[in-house]
Amino acid sequence: MTRSDELFEQAKKTIPGGVNSPVRAFNGVGGSPRFIEKADGAYIYDADGKAYIDYVGSWGPMILGHNHPKIREAVLAAVENGLSFGAPTELEVTMAEKVIEMVPSMEQVRMVSSGTEATMSAIRLARGFTSRDKILKFEGCYHGHADCLLVKAGSGALTLGQPSSPGIPEDFAKHTLTATYNDLESVKALFEQYPEEISCIILEPVAGNMNCIPPVEGFLQGLRAICDQYGALMIIDEVMTGFRVSKSGAQGHYGVTPDLTTLGKVIGGGMPVGAFGGRKDVMQFIAPTGPVYQAGTLSGNPIAMSAGLAQMDALCEEGVYEELAAKTKRIAEGFKAAANKHGIPMSINYVGGMFGLFFTEEEKVTSFEQVTKCDADKFPEFYHGMLDEGVYLAPSAYEAGFLSMAHGEKELEETLAAADRVFAKMAK
C-alpha cells in the first residue's frame, strides 16, 4: 500500500468520500487518488515522492506553472502586512483596474472568493436587473454548485453519473431552462416559449466541463443577437477560460461582447478567488449602489489580490499566449498522432492553453451528446497508463487538460513518448 493509499483510507474516516471535491476521488477512473505534497514548475510530487508532469494545473489557475517565483514573492510580501482586513484595500482597486484593462466588456468588477460565488451573484444580478426569474443554461456546462445551476450540470456531476443533485427543491429548478450547446435553434425555441421571462443566458464560451468543446462558428454571436432581441442579459462564464484562452479571455478570442462576465482560477494565481463584472449600468444594481444584495467576508482579500496581480502582470508580457497556444497544439495533435499510430480512434479539441481528448471515431466533437457517446472504457485504461508513466491528467473523461508556461520541450517530448507506449499496450 502506498502512502497515498494510506492517506486516502485515513481521509475517508473524517472527510466524505475522502476528498473535498468529488472528482478528486478517482471515481471516474478507479483506484486511489494521489495525495500531493508539493509542486514546482510543470511537476507535482505525491506523498510517496513520485514526480508527475502535470496537465491539471489545479484545474486551470497555474498558467505560469506551479510555485512561480514572482507569485510566491508577491504572496510572501503581502503576508508581512496581514492576511485579511475586512476593509477596502488599494490592491483590490488595482486588480479591478487590471481586469477592466484586459477585458473591455467589464466596465466595473466585484471581487468574490470562488467561481461559484461569481456565477451565483451574476445570475442574481441579472434577475434583479431584468425583473425576470428564469435563466437559460446549456446541458453539460458547469457553473459551480449553486442550486439553480445544478440542473443537467457537467464536470463532476457527469463523472459521478448525477446530472442533477438531491437537495434542490423543484421550485428552484423550474426556473432553470436547459438548451443544447452549439445549437441556436434549441435556444430560440425556449425564448419563443418564454419571451418575457428569461433574465439571462449563462454559458461557458468553451465548454470545459464536458471535456473541451469550443463554440461552432456563429454560436456565440447568435446568442448575443437572441439576448438583444428579447432583452435578456448574456453572461459568459470565463472562470475557466478567462486569461487562459487569450489575454482578453474567450470573449476576446471569439469576438463577442457579453453583458456580464464571471472570472476565477487564473486571476487568483492559485489562491481562492472569483469575480464578476460587466456593463456599468448593470453593475450599479449591486449593493451598496443598488438593491441586489451580495457580500463576502474575504472578498478582495490582499493575499489573493497580490498573487493574482503578479500572475496577470506576467501574462501581459509579449508572446506569452502565442507560446502557450503552440505548446497546446503540439501536445494535443501529438496525442492524436500517437493514438492513430496504434489504431485507436481519437478526436481532439484545443484552444489557447486547454485541450480535450475524446475516444471516438467521430472526426470532430462539438456537442454534449457526442461526448456522452465516447468510449467510456478506454479513458480509465489510458489514464492509469499515463499515471504509471509519470503523467498526471484530470481523473475524468469530462475534464479539460491544461498547459502552463512551465511546460518545456522536455516535458512535451516525455509526455508524448509515454502516450505512445500506453497506446501500444492498449492496442494489444
Swiss-Prot record:
It comes from the Bacteria. The modification N6-(pyridoxal phosphate)lysine is found at residue 265. InterPro entries: 4pyrrol_synth_GluAld_NH2Trfase, Aminotrans_3, Aminotrans_3_PPA_site, PyrdxlP-dep_Trfase, PyrdxlP-dep_Trfase_major, PyrdxlP-dep_Trfase_small. Pathway: Porphyrin-containing compound metabolism; protoporphyrin-IX biosynthesis; 5-aminolevulinate from L-glutamyl-tRNA(Glu): step 2/2. One of its GO terms (cellular component) is cytoplasm. GO terms for biological process: protoporphyrinogen IX biosynthetic process. Keywords: Cytoplasm, Isomerase, Porphyrin biosynthesis, Pyridoxal phosphate. Its cofactor is pyridoxal 5'-phosphate. Homodimer. HAMAP family: HemL_aminotrans_3. This is Glutamate-1-semialdehyde 2,1-aminomutase. It comes from Shewanella sediminis (strain HAW-EB3).
